[in-house]
Regions:
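Extended, composition-driven regions rather than compact fold-specific motifs
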Residues: 1-268
């Protein structure tokens, strides 16, 4: 078997479409090449490459030390960032969960209009490795965009783990019936929109502060992530190596317009 570069793009086909809730749709993606996919854990970041209008198949990038290279720059695809929900090496499939919000964004539009056989591209996985560090106590917090990663990570956490999971979801039906928590983990749910972020942050501030033996994993909309990261770093004095706090998106912006600000926030 030829050994691939650690950075590789895969052309995949929609194999199955599963509506998980009123606001989440899962696409199961297949390619024989995925038998050799460098998967290490669910919840890892990946790029998806979507064909432009009038195209049936997206152009895939070449990778260099400076990012993507495009053979035809004028025809490069729409690029978005998602997380791996599940990987099955035997079936050669990867599952990605998409938030459904109509045609207002290209990835959501693709997912809502998807048909078996539709093509897209995906990258090799990225992000911290490991994504989740062993800890005495955990804090998970996020909105519906972070839910697939949170559920994936909880599925692999040690059975004696303890801590808190705090979710902001559009409606109660978006809470997965498959969500499984160790007995020592407490679940806190808020149902509604971003106006509930202050109440969510207030709740988290009442928890016993995490220490250097603990770990926090936080993701979602920027106005949710920013105050929680401030709480972790300033009030709780939690070192950067003991938390992951990444804004996946910012209301009113797309991935291109938010890219620089997002990376500046992460790198602070």
């Amino acid at each position: 078997m030829n050994k691939r570069s650690p950075h590789h793009a895969y052309l995949v086909r929609v194999q199955d479409i599963i509506d998980l809730s009123p606001n989440l749709r899962r696409l199961v993606l297949h390619s024989d090449e995925l038998a050799d996919y460098p998967h290490q854990f669910n919840g890892a970041h990946i790029k998806i490459f979507l064909a432009r209008h009038g195209q049936s198949t997206p152009q895939l990038p070449q990778f260099s030390g400076h990012g993507f290279n495009w053979v035809e720059p004028d025809n490069k695809p729409i690029v978005r960032t998602y997380t791996i929900r599940d990987y099955d090496a035997k079936a050669c499939t990867i599952s990605i969960d998409f938030v459904k919000h109509g045609n207002s964004a290209p990835a959501s539009a693709f997912a809502e209009q998807a048909q078996p056989g539709n093509m897209l591209g995906i990258s090799s996985p990225g992000g911290p490795n490991p994504m989740l560090k062993t800890a005495a106590r955990y804090l998970f917090a996020g909105d519906i965009t972070a839910l697939p990663a949170i559920e994936s990570l909880l599925a692999t956490i040690q059975t004696d783990a303890c801590g808190d999971v705090v979710l902001l979801l559009p409606q109660v039906e978006d809470l997965p019936a498959t969500l499984s928590l160790p007995a020592g983990m407490r679940l806190h749910t808020f149902y509604g929109d971003l106006s509930l972020v202050p109440a969510l942050v207030k709740l988290v501030s009442t928890f016993a502060p995490l220490t250097c033996d603990d770990f926090a994993w936080i993701a979602g909309e920027a106005t949710l992530v920013k105050p929680l990261r401030e709480l972790l770093r300033t009030q709780w004095q939690l070192p950067p190596l003991r938390h992951y706090a990444v804004p996946y998106w910012r209301q009113g912006e797309n991935e291109e317009s938010y890219h620089a600000a997002r990376h500046n926030f992460i790198e602070k």
